[in-house]
């Protein structure tokens, strides 16, 4: 007899142990269920309602236990619409938390919060399943070595490097290249690190999820001909889903990523778009459960909920999960509790700039606004650190001079400032790069640039050795040797035109 139910054990129970209850009350996505004495389910257990509505349509609703109300009653939150449910319907306690399929069979497929495929490609051929509620890795399992996660993208690796097993915040409005940057990272981790990616669409637009899927198929990140060779699994809980689904879809994606890290011992990229929607869904559920709201109307358990997700994203001795999280900042207020709680967990920020995108510089990563805790001499080495600082100083000086240039023109600047501007413009263009996933749109072959090559290139620009080359030669190239080759080509083209 279970008299003191708390959080359930990870293993599923046998059919004999499954107890049944009855729906007592339905308020929107929240159900109150009464069970026989001593048969109460554990907190976080999955409950299933299988019945028929008044039109004789099949109902199949999964819920998650959130509260114990006393008098043999529990309060659960539905993971799908509660249309057609009625008081008195039978509810089955599955005896375990929600479990989702994991492993190689998930690659190239789209799942919902319950781990059910929603891409009309048939069932998933995976015998392995993991519960979505799992403990964070123990301290003894964590990899304490600070190491850089090389992405092959110059601006990221030089100025705001990612930490292996770290968490990165991605800030950017619509149409500045967030999706293309995400797809390039998925492509590069597969090629350079032999890793895979999991994309968690949390509370965002269904259209965007569909566009991402179509673009991934077009760029080859999802291989339609041989689905197992795809590099990414997609988990969607979009804006139209009930708050329970939006609150748990991040955990479903994370659970799939944990399998690749812990069992396959791979480096995994986990994308969460958008982490703010995870908090927002938690706030909605908290209100539905009758909890007293905290600051700005958010749930009182905000920090705990965020921590339980973020602490599972870590680098262990087996493999790593590096997470890139799109962060929506409500009303651009960085002190709002949702983004403020997220910032406490981030190791780096990648800020996309509309100004750079309008100049045609892609990736449109803002070199001055993007930051990383990894950019320290003891971690990246003196050469990398000093090069990055000099690049930032040059770009900052150029930014300060732009007002003067706009009013008086370049001719009014001192010789030293004119040289700084010329080098800054070369640096700005050299920070652009052709992407593999954009080949189908641009016709330019993609480039993966190793960190050592990136540092060498910027050192040559800063030293003045390349002052004679036109700035156009640095635009959309890989390493610095390609810029020199492009300069010769441009010169020959100019001669032939004359």
Curated annotation (Swiss-Prot):
GO annotation, cellular component aspect: chloroplast thylakoid membrane; mitochondrion; proton-transporting ATP synthase complex
Quote the CDD domains the UniProt record gives.
Answer: ATP-synt_F1_beta_C, ATP-synt_F1_beta_N, F1-ATPase_beta_CD
Q: Does the keyword Lipid biosynthesis apply?
A: no
Q: What is its main location?
A: plastid
Where does it localize? Answer: Plastid, Chloroplast thylakoid membrane
Q: Where ATP is bound, by residue?
A: 172-179
- Output the superkingdom of the source species: Eukaryota
Single Gene Ontology BP annotation: proton motive force-driven mitochondrial ATP synthesis
EC number annotated for this UniProt entry: 7.1.2.2
Q: Does the keyword Nucleotide-binding apply?
A: yes
- One MF term in the entry's GO annotations: proton-transporting ATP synthase activity, rotational mechanism
Q: Which reaction does it catalyse?
A: ATP + H2O + 4 H(+)(in) = ADP + phosphate + 5 H(+)(out)
Give one Pfam family, short name only: ATP-synt_VA_C
Note the PROSITE patterns from the entry: ATPASE_ALPHA_BETA (PS00152)
Q: NCBIfam families, alphabetically?
A: atpD (TIGR01039)
Q: How does the record describe its quaternary structure? A: F-type ATPases have 2 components, CF(1) - the catalytic core - and CF(0) - the membrane proton channel. CF(1) has five subunits: alpha(3), beta(3), gamma(1), delta(1), epsilon(1). CF(0) has four main subunits: a(1), b(1), b'(1) and c(9-12).
Q: What protein am I looking at? A: ATP synthase subunit beta, chloroplastic
Q: What is the lineage of its organism?
A: Eukaryota, Viridiplantae, Streptophyta, Embryophyta, Tracheophyta
> Gene name on record?
atpB
């Amino acid at each position: 007899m279970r008299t003191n139910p708390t959080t359930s054990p990870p293993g599923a129970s046998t059919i004999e142990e499954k107890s049944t209850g009855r729906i007592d009350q339905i308020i929107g996505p929240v159900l109150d269920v009464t069970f026989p004495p001593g048969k109460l389910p554990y907190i976080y257990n999955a409950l299933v309602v299988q019945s028929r509505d008044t039109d004789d349509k099949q109902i199949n609703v999964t819920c998650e236990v959130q509260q114990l109300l006393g008098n043999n009653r529990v309060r659960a939150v539905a993971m799908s619409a509660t249309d057609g449910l009625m008081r008195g319907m039978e509810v089955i306690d599955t005896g375990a938390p929600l479990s989702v399929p994991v492993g190689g069979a998930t690659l190239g497929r789209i799942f919902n919060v319950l781990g059910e495929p929603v891409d009309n490609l048939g069932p998933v051929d995976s015998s392995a399943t993991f519960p979505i509620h799992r403990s964070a890795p123990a301290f003894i399992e964590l990899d304490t070595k600070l190491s850089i996660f090389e992405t092959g993208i110059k601006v990221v690796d030089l100025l705001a490097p990612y930490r292996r097993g770290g968490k990165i915040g991605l800030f950017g409005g619509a149409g500045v290249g967030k999706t293309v940057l995400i797809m390039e990272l998925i492509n590069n981790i597969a090629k350079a690190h032999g890793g895979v990616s999991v994309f968690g669409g949390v509370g965002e637009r269904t259209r965007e999820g569909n566009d991402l899927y179509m673009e991934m198929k077009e760029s080859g990140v999802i291989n339609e001909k041989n689905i197992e060779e795809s590099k990414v699994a997609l988990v969607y809980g979009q804006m139209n889903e009930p708050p329970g689904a939006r609150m748990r879809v991040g955990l479903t994606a994370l659970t799939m990523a944990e399998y690749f890290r812990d069992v396959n011992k791979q480096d995994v990229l986990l994308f969460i778009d958008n982490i703010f929607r995870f908090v927002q869904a938690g706030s909605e559920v908290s209100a539905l459960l009758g909890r007293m709201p905290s600051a700005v109307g958010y749930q009182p358990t905000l920090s705990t909920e965020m921590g339980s997700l973020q602490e599972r994203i870590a680098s262990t001795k087996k493999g790593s999960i590096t997470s890139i999280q799109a962060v929506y900042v409500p009303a651009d207020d960085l002190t709002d509790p949702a983004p403020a709680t997220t910032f406490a967990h981030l190791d780096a920020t990648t800020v996309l700039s509309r100004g750079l995108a309008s100049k045609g510089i892609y990736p449109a990563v803002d070199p001055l606004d993007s930051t990383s805790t990894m950019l320290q001499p003891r971690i990246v080495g003196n050469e990398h650190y000093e090069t990055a600082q000099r690049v930032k100083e040059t770009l900052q000086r150029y930014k300060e001079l732009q007002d003067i240039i706009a009013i008086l023109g370049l001719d009014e600047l001192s010789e030293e400032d004119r040289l700084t501007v010329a080098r800054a413009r070369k640096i700005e263009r050299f920070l652009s790069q052709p992407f593999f996933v954009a080949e189908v749109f641009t016709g330019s072959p993609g480039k993966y640039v190793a960190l050592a090559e990136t540092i060498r290139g910027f050192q040559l620009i800063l030293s003045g050795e390349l002052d004679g080359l036109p700035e156009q030669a640095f635009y959309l190239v890989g390493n610095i040797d390609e810029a020199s080759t492009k300069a010769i080509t441009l010169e020959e083209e100019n001669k032939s035109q004359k």
